[in-house]
Structures are given as structure tokens and as C-alpha cells.
Regions:
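N-terminal lobe/hinge region of extracytoplasmic solute-binding protein
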Residues: 37-99, 210-212
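Gly/Pro-rich hinge or "lid" segments in bacterial periplasmic/extracellular proteins
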Residues: 69-82, 86, 180-240, 244, ...
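Aromatic- and charge-enriched surface segment that lines or borders ligand/interaction sites
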Residues: 93-138, 157, 163-168, 256-259, ...
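Surface-exposed binding/hinge segments that line
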Residues: 107, 143-194, 219
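Ligand-site clamp/hinge motif
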Residues: 109, 203, 232-278, 400, ...
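Structural transition elements
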Residues: 333-370, 387-393
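Extracytoplasmic/peripheral linker and loop segments enriched in polar/acidic and small residues
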Residues: 337, 355-358, 404-419, 424, ...
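Long beta-strand-rich cores associated with HINT superfamily self-processing modules
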Residues: 512-535
């Protein structure tokens, strides 16, 4: 399909008055308009709602304020990136940690207002924090990772003074207050929409924004487009240069690339690795690449379901994965290999790090025989269609290879908007997925992905009390030698029992016009439009 035909057909199919990107670009070349093309957009305007996807994190980041944010530094290749060791003011203009380290007092900006003009007070912060530790699921578990767990920890001192009491000394607590989840809601506005069954107003905030951040949602057509408008009365940082953002969902990678190279789109960050490789070599646009910290592509097996409850079957799968083919044909070498290490032991405290599995069909067949399933079995291999540019070709290669050891896979494509909800069900036997921990510590990754509390991202439903002890010890250990021993303990178990098989550490690639300046790599993998400007 031709690009112009595609644009016309999407507008007609939507049955809306969405302006074609081509017309937007040609009619408004002003510096304050940014046009973005994505494969998948937000499925919710509220990060606290069940199943909110990664693009929803971007809504939270720019439409809501947090008490603090992270500083910046130069990363690999000179790309500007966040600095998790440096906290800076956002809604809070200052803070003071108690001498005993068991509480922190925040002083709020007295001139901050929500998008409807209502003042932001400590009561709003208290209500928002109570909400995030009470709604359950992802937001509650995220804050628990930093020992932020109970409403009783949050205290309104006065209208513009707020205190957080810590239940234990945890190096992640302050950092956890600067991730997307602890955002501040207009509590009085949301309270107008609560019900007995929905005491936190989640149904309303899923489709309605209630923040006071640098941008407000001007319009949202789920599955099609979200439009942001700058909030000119924002006081929690430097007012952004970009006044309006049109973020359009265009499923076809070919169309996104064509629109970008023609100049109809300013930026895209969801493209096949092959396209990023070609565009970086072509020189028409700028491609910025950063290895994603604390992140892996992996094959996960549900250990509660036979035959994946047998470690030997899981090890057989680990030896049957065609790692090199996936790296070459699905990832186009735009990732870091995590297979073929010296052995299945931890080497240092870095994460991710390579395991000792490599492509070895005879060894995989021998393990299948030892497991009592020499004749193989049938299963379903599922992936997120929202990351299909990598996942689909990788799944085809994995299925072809597993067939060599008798495992016949039916490939299931799950729409991106439904993927998180599907993960929550914990009923998919075999998946290809990508996960990255927001806070760059191995114990944080393992707390999310391997701990027996069985968080949403423990997609394998793996539970091992012995590993839990190592994870918990590492979270609070201050002695470096003991910390290294704890990390080695849980990494060694993960490699031996292999409920998930790491494939590669992904890159974050972003392609943009040459006049776009200010891009920053963030751990949540969404562009911070507040930083961008057109030169």
C-alpha cells in the first residue's frame, strides 16, 4: 500500500476527523509542533490502572508531577541519559532526610497548580500515595520494591509540607519516589468520580487525565492517536519549548519509516532493528542508540505447568534456542548477546550477564530424554504484537528450532494493548518477552522477576524460597563482599533452574529529524517531550 493511501485509509477507517500527518507537517512547520509516529500507543491515561502498558508510562511522565526527578549524565556514545544517583526537585522544591535516615520531609512548591487551576497541596500528595500502595498490582508492587508500602507512612504536616516515614533503611526508597508511579493526582477532581466498587476512581482516570504536569491531554483516541498540549502554568521545571505533540499510532513499520524520511514525522522510537541500522547508515535522519540498562529479551516458561515444571525440559529449551540466528535475523545485531558464557555461574554483580547455554541440539535432545519427554509435546508460544518487529521473526526461529527436539509450537500473537493483562493471568505456557528494571540493581530485577511474591513480571510463576533469601539479603546488604555473594546466589540459581532463558540485552533506538535536539534516554523507555526542541 502506498503511504498516501495508507494515511487516507486509516483516517477513513477510524471514522474521525484526524488530520493526516502529511497535512500536519506541511501546514505547520513551526517549532512548537512535534509529530510522533509509534507502533503502539497508551491503553490507559493512568499508570495505576490494571494492565497499563509501557506507552502509558509516557502519559504519566509528562502529564503528572512527582516530588522528585532524576538528574542527567552523558551515556554510551555521548547520548544524554538519566542519572539514577542524582535526584533533583520537581513538585518538591526541597527535601530533608532525617539524621537517622528513617524519614524525609518534602517542601512543596506553593505556586504549583493542577490543569484545572486548583492548587497542589500535601493533601493531594497524601491521597495519591495512599492510592498507589492500595490499588494492588503493578503500582503497589513497584513501590514495595523501595519499601514504600503503607498509607501510614505518609503524613501531611501542613498544606505544603509532606513527610514519608520509612519502615526500614532501603537504598531504593528515595529513587523509587522518582519513578513514574508516585505521581500526584488532583484528588478532589478524581473523588468526584469514585464509586463503592471503585474507591480510587480508576475507571475514570483510565480515560481522563487529572494531573498538573508540563503537558495535558488535549484528546485521546485509543488505538489511533493521543494529542498533548503544553500547560503554560507549569511551575515544576523549565517550560518546554514544544507546545503541542501529535502522537499517532501507525502499525506499519514501513509507513513509519517512509513518513520519517520524507519529513512528515519528527520522531519514532518503535522500528525494526533492520530499519534503524539502515537509517543510521543512510544519514537522512539521526539515530540515537543506548543499551537498555537492567533489561533482557527472554524466553519464559510457566513452571507451574507440565512439562515446563521439569528443570531438565527448561534446560533443553535453553540449548535448543537458535541464539545467533535471532541476533542476526530478528535483532540485526542491535543488542548485546547473553548466551555462550564461560559457564552457568555469576561473574561479578553486573546484570544482565551471559549464561553458559548455547545452541546444542544433541544436548537438548538428551535432556528431553532424561526428562521423560523424548517424543516431545505440543505447546503455545506467545508474544506481544506491540513488539512484533523483533518478536515475530524471533518466535518463528524459536518454533522451528524447538521442533527439532519434538516441541511443536503454535504461535500466538497477543495485541499490544492486551499483553499486560494477559501476563497477569499467568496462564501462557511459553512466551517471548522483554523486561527492564527501572532501578539499575540486579536485586531489583530479581525482586520483580523471580521472587515468590509472584509479581506481574514473574511471568514464569517461579517460586524458590532459597532464591528469595538471596534477593532479600542483597536488597539491604551494605557489605560489598556479602552483597556479591548474595547476587551470585540468585544469579546461579536462575541460570541452573532457567525458568527464563536470557537471549540478549536490547538497545533503545530512536530515530528523529536532524533539527530535533534535547533527546534523553530514560529508564521507562519513553521520550521526555519536555526536553525536546526544534533547532
Amino acid at each position: 500500500m502506498k503511504r498516501r493511501d495508507f494515511i487516507t485509509s486509516t483516517v477513513a477507517a477510524a471514522g474521525t476527523l484526524m488530520i493526516p500527518l502529511e497535512a500536519l507537517a506541511q501546514s505547520d512547520r513551526r517549532k512548537e509542533l512535534l509529530i510522533v509516529a509509534n507502533e503502539t500507543g497508551p491503553n490507559s491515561l493512568d499508570i495505576h490502572t490494571v494492565g497499563a502498558n509501557r506507552p502509558s508510562y509516557g502519559v504519566s511522565w509528562i502529564c503528572y508531577d512527582r516530588l522528585m526527578t532524576f538528574g542527567k549524565k552523558k551515556g554510551p556514545g555521548g547520548v544524554t541519559m538519566y542519572d539514577f544517583t542524582k535526584l533533583e526537585p520537581e513538585l518538591a522544591e526541597s527535601w530533608q532526610v532525617a539524621p537517622d535516615g528513617m524519614s524525609v520531609v518534602f517542601k512543596l512548591r506553593k505556586n504549583a497548580k493542577f490543569h484545572d487551576g486548583a492548587p497542589v497541596t500535601a493533601k493531594d500528595v497524601k491521597w495519591s500515595f495512599d492510592r498507589m500502595v492500595s490499588v494492588g498490582g503493578f503500582p503497589t508492587f513497584q513501590m514495595k520494591a523501595g519499601s514504600i508500602e503503607k498509607p501510614e507512612q505518609f503524613v501531611v504536616v501542613d498544606d505544603y509540607t509532606f513527610r514519608v516515614n520509612f519502615i526500614r533503611k532501603d537504598k531504593l526508597s528515595m529513587m523509587d519516589l522518582a519513578v513514574p508511579v508516585p505521581c500526584v493526582y488532583n484528588s478532589e477532581l478524581v473523588k468526584k468520580h469514585v464509586t463503592e466498587k471503585d474507591p480510587w476512581g480508576l475507571d475514570w482516570t483510565k480515560a481522563n487525565e487529572a494531573g498538573g504536569g508540563a503537558y495535558k491531554v488535549e484528546s485521546w483516541k485509543p488505538g489511533q492517536e493521543i494529542v498533548y498540549a503544553r500547560y503554560d502554568d507549569w511551575k515544576s521545571g523549565k517550560l518546554p519549548k514544544i507546545k503541542r505533540i501529535v502522537q499517532r499510532e501507525i502499525p506499519s513499520a514501513g509507513n513509519r519509516r517512509a513518513l520519517l524520511e520524507k519529513g512528515d514525522v519528527d520522531i519514532t522510537y518503535e522500528m525494526p532493528p533492520k530499519d534503524f541500522l539502515e537509517m543510521s547508515e543512510g544519514g537522512k535522519v539521526v539515530v540515537q542508540t543506548t543499551p537498555i540498562e537492567n533489561a533482557i529479551w527472554y524466553v519464559g516458561m510457566n513452571v507451574t505447568r507440565p512439562p515446563f515444571n521439569n528443570p531438565k525440559v527448561r534446560q533443553a529449551v535453553a540449548y535448543a534456542i537458535p541464539y545467533e540466528k535471532i541476533m542476526d535475523s530478528a535483532m540485526y545485531k542491535r543488542a548485546t548477546r547473553l548466551w555462550g558464557g564461560k559457564d552457568n555461574k555469576a561473574h561479578g554483580t553486573d546484570w544482565p550477564q551471559p549464561h553458559g547455554y548455547a545452541y546444542d541440539i544433541p544436548k537438548a535432545r538428551a535432556l528431553m530424554k532424561e526428562a521423560g519427554v523424548a517424543d516431545g509435546f505440543e505447546t503455545t508460544l506467545s508474544f506481544d504484537l506491540g513488539s512484533g518487529t523483533v518478536s515475530e521473526p524471533a518466535c518463528v526461529l524459536i518454533a522451528e528450532s524447538l521442533a527439532l527436539i519434538g516441541i511443536k509450537c503454535r504461535i500466538e500473537k497477543v495485541p499490544g494493548a492486551n499483553w499486560r493483562a494477559q501476563l497477569l493471568k499467568k496462564d501462557m505456557p511459553l512466551i517471548l518477552n522483554r523486561f527492564g528494571g527501572w532501578l539499575n540493581y540486579p536485586e531489583y530485577f530479581f525482586f520483580w522477576c523471580y521472587h515468590s511474591q509472584d509479581a506481574v513480571f514473574n511471568t514464569m510463576s517461579y517460586k524458590n524460597p532459597a532464591m528469595d533469601k538471596f534477593i532479600e539479603a542483597a536488597r539491604f546488604e551494605s557489605d560489598r563482599k556479602k552483597y556479591a555473594e548474595d547476587v551470585a546466589g540468585f544469579v546461579n540459581m536462575a541460570f541452573d533452574e532457567v525458568p527464563r532463558v536470557p537471549l540478549a540485552q536490547p538497545n533503545m533506538d530512536v530515530a528523529m529529524q536532524k533539527n530535533i535536539k534535547g533527546y534523553t534516554y530514560w529508564f521507562h523507555l519513553q521520550p521526555d517531550y519536555r526536553d525536546l526542541e526544534k533547532a
